């Protein structure tokens, strides 16, 4: 299942990178982008535990600041190649058919699929959570057949009220084998568990019969476990240091 999760995540990273025009390659060892990817996104994702630095490093641009590698099985040592460990996390898996936990919120979240560039702009602004605009999620993503982006709104929020900002959101990537859950956020941290429940519900509706996968760390790993996910193995993200080989 960890291989399926890694492959699904590589597909999502590839979709984001394609929307920026990044040329990429994929084989049984890794997905790689020949040009620096958008912020927060890796330049390579390994797809098998025996992938080696040789499988990756000649296919990515280590000369540009921010170059990173997602080591999906936490088996690489990229220290000799000028990388440092940025963080570790756990792949997670939730079986298909497991009911979503009931929400304990006094007000229910309404979920909407993002379908327009304007809606994607609002989603991205809410996801980033800062005044400085970001350019990561571009409208071309809305044409990716495997990608579905969702906003969650508190019931009663509408354009008529003058405040239709998302209360939360998430991304589902359905590749036919598993559904990847990523980029989950809540504008109010007290609603984060409700957004998890909403994401599980939408995954079952849009990609029925498929297990959910993703990766988390810290408090969000604990929330994932509370919502029926189980850890299935570690991953590691490596960041290249400027001036290194």
Predicted feature residues:
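A short, well-structured alpha-helix characteristic of acyl/acetyltransferase catalytic modules
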Residues: 116-126
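Conserved acetyl-CoA-binding loop-helix of GNAT-fold acetyltransferases
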Residues: 53-55, 186-206
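N-terminal charged segments
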Residues: 1-63, 72, 129-146
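Terminal substrate-recognition subdomain of acyl/acetyltransferases
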Residues: 1-21, 34-36, 95-101, 173-175, ...
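Acyl-donor-binding surface of acyltransferase catalytic domains
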Residues: 47-117, 212-222, 229-241
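A conserved beta-strand-loop-helix scaffold within acyl/acetyltransferase catalytic domains
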Residues: 132-157, 162-187, 233
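Alpha-helix C-terminal capping segments
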Residues: 56-64, 127, 200-208
């Amino acid at each position: 299942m960890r291989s399926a999760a890694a492959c699904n995540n590589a597909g999502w990273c590839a979709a984001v990178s394609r929307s920026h025009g990044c040329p990429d390659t994929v084989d049984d060892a890794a997905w790689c982008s020949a040009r620096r990817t958008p912020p927060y996104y890796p330049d390579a994702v390994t797809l098998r535990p025996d992938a080696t630095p040789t499988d990756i490093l000649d296919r990515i641009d280590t000369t540009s600041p921010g170059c990173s590698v997602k080591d999906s099985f936490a088996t690489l040592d990229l220290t000799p190649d000028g990388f440092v460990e940025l963080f570790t996390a756990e792949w997670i898996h939730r079986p298909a058919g497991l009911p979503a936990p009931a929400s304990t919120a006094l007000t229910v979240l309404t979920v909407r699929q993002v379908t327009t560039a304007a809606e994607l702009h609002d989603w991205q602004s809410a996801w980033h959570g800062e005044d400085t605009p970001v350019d990561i999620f571009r409208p071309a993503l809305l044409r990716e057949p495997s990608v579905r982006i969702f906003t969650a709104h508190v019931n009663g929020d509408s354009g008529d009220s003058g405040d239709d900002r998302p209360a939360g959101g998430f991304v589902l990537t359905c590749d036919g084998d598993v559904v990847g859950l990523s980029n989950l956020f809540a504008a109010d941290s007290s609603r984060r568990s409700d957004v998890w429940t909403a994401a599980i519900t939408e995954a079952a509706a849009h990609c029925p019969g498929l297990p959910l996968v993703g990766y988390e760390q810290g408090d969000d790993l604990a929330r994932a476990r509370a919502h029926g996910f189980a850890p299935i193995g570690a991953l590691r993200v490596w960041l290249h240091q400027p001036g290194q080989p």
